Amino acid sequence: MNFHILTLFPDMVENGLKTSITGRAIESGAISVVAVDIRDYTTDKHRHVDDAPYGGGAGMVIQPAPVCDAYEALCKKLGKRPRVIYMTPQGRVFNQSIAQDLAKEEDLVFLCGHYEGIDERALELIQAEYLSAGDFVLTGGELPSMVMIDCISRLVPGVLGNGDSAEVESFYDNLLEYPQYTRPEVYEGKPVPEVLLSGHHKNIESWRREQSIRRTLERRPDLLEDASLTLKEQKFLDSLLKEQGESRLKELEQLVREAVKSDETPGSDREYYQQMKKVKKLLNEKKATLQELKGYYKVLGALKQEI
């Protein structure tokens, strides 16, 4: 995969990505990172890229011509027009799902703004997509672009030494990663969980999955809405939620019942059980999340009431 970074500070991004995993990936050829200096596409001897904003206001704005010319030169070199990601707090907040989508690209362009941003016309002409590292303001787009490239690179085949590494890390399945342990077996009176020493791989996998669910509930419960869980895992989550007086499965069952049953409808009990059988099958095969099913039956029930 090839990353192209349009920036005013090429040394910053190239040097920052030439270490650790991304550095080894560059050396092996799994990825390439090329920084393009936007100043190389200016026309004056002082290489100015910015000017005062029309309408007044603080700061300076990057002019459209150097940005567009840099991108068009890259397109000519590649023989195609790759996706452009503009780093801005106005964009969608970057996450693992977006990373997985971007990792499918062969070439990806990151546009790093500075000062008060980039002339809007340039962004429109190059059809930039807006992404943000979070709801905060930085001096420029270089650091966010490096963060995103690091994340996306890990999903590129051949970058990680262990092919399973990316699949068990936090957010891959909308769950946080399970706790990790290494030697010594006991430290400051705190032992490693016995199951990890058992050598029983199935039990270890089950324990890790449950720990991921438990940790996500404690630290990022918002992620559970779209987590892909089997029926057994849903029941485990429900057992944790019951301690808080909640039950996600009970809520789904009630929505299914309301969607298929009314006092005047004969055979609705049978339809309810048939629907729940399908629901359990979809959950076990991870073809739908609990949240998706709840949404479906909520709408179905509302439509029946309207009819």
Where in this protein do the model-derived segments appear?
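N-terminal nucleotide/polyanion-binding subdomain common to many enzyme families
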Residues: 1-74, 202-218, 222-225
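C-terminal accessory regions appended to core domains
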Residues: 208-251
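Amphipathic, heptad-repeat alpha-helical segments
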Residues: 249-276
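Structured adenosyl-cofactor binding patch, chiefly the S-adenosyl-L-methionine
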Residues: 118, 122-169
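Hydrophobic/aromatic beta-strand patches that form the interior of the parallel beta-sheet core
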Residues: 4-6, 34-36, 85, 108-109, ...
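Internal, active-site/partner-interface "lid" segment
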Residues: 143, 155-195
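Charged, low-complexity interaction regions
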Residues: 260-270, 282-294
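S-adenosyl-L-methionine/SAH cofactor-binding core of RNA-modifying enzymes
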Residues: 63-114, 119, 157
